[in-house]
Amino acid sequence: MKIAIASDHAGFRYKELVKKHLASKQIEFEDFGTNNEKLCDYPDFIAPAARALQAQKVDRLIVLGGSGNGEAIVANRFRGVRCCLCLNAEMARLARMHNDSNAISVGQRLIGENQLLTIVDTWIDTKFEGGRH
């Protein structure tokens, strides 16, 4: 599995934590930026990452911002990207299980650091249920 990851300035710190976590689990990733906490426009980083998912250059996508809302909106503009805002592990589990989400958006200002990696792991480890979904 290869995961694209991108953030704006408000999600940069959590993006760096997710990258370290993915590396520790030997999960390949590609970082689309931003590369610091300097104010920036999130679509500049989210759109290229979503394009990579759309083009099947990566298997999944994680985007991060202040609330995660704008990032999810941008990601979902690309055909084939199914990005769900996940504020807890249950949302991440259902995003995969029922919605076959191939992308998640996380809000750094809305969740605690202790929740972040649980959300990511739950989303990565959960299988799509299929069937009526």
Give short role names for the model-derived ranges.
Residues A47, R51, I73, R93-R96, ...:
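Alpha-helical segments flanking ligand/cofactor-binding loops in enzyme cores
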Residues E28-L39:
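A short beta-strand-loop structural module common to alpha/beta enzyme folds
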